[in-house]
Amino acid sequence: MASAKKNKDINHNSLVAIKPITDNQKVVFDTWKKGKNQFLFGAAGPGKTFISIYLAMQAVMDLKAKPEKVILVRSLIPTREIGFLPVDEEDKAALYQVPYQNMVQFMFEMPNEQSFSNRYDRLKGQGTLYFLSTSFLRGLTFDNAIIIVDECQNINFHELDTIITRVGQDSRIMFCGDFDQTDLQKTNEKNGLHDFLRILGEMEEFNCTEFTIGDIVRSGFVRSYLINKIKLGIGME
């Protein structure tokens, strides 16, 4: 296993060292190192998805660790029923992968500009990274993998239940989401994530971290906007 990881074009040698910026990020780094699965939720902009992908990449590129691949899972809302579109699955999902393409570029040392622009595709090509829609998970088992479920506020309880029961041997899972950014319309679907969090909160295998406005690292502009949005009570359900 170590030899296979070492011989991949993109490996641990090019992964940059990234340290936590906020206290809550440090909690995630520390509990992940102790073997905990993660449920990260709260304000937009604290780096939930970024640090999840980084920690996952760090794990799968560790020559001594058993996980061999990162699997990004996301619901393709508002087009959940993407099977009706006359294109293949990769084309349908391409738009939803743009944020991850941007993120992974900053996790690795780049010898040239071309390497910077195609890093995501090369990780997929060498079998280190996969992207899957929630529509295509039933019946699968993920062994030797780190599963990252992003934008999980757009996934109902039934789908969350399906996803977490895909976790196989020598695998771990991370959930990232923001209750305030859900695209789900029905109350019972929105409540599904809250119920799911209650279950994970009882599991010793999980660390659940809520990020607040004070954790925002995207920009001071975003922090100011959210502070005033909350102060005025606008867009709050």
Each model region followed by its residue ranges:
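Conserved coupling/interface region of RecA-like P-loop/ASCE motor cores
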Residues: 196-237
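Conserved nucleotide-binding/hydrolysis micro-motifs of P-loop NTPases
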Residues: 45-46, 75-80, 137-138, 154, ...
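Pre-Walker A (Motif I) flank of P-loop NTPase domains
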Residues: 34-40, 144
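Conserved RecA-like ASCE ATPase "motif II neighborhood" in helicase/translocase motors
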Residues: 124-162
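Structural recognition of the conserved hydrophobic beta-strand(s) that form the central parallel beta-sheet
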Residues: 72, 131, 148, 172-178
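Interdomain "pre-motor" coupling segment immediately N-terminal to P-loop NTPase/helicase cores
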Residues: 1-8
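Conserved P-loop
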Residues: 39-43, 50-119, 184-202
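Pre-Walker A adenine-sensing motif
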Residues: 17-35
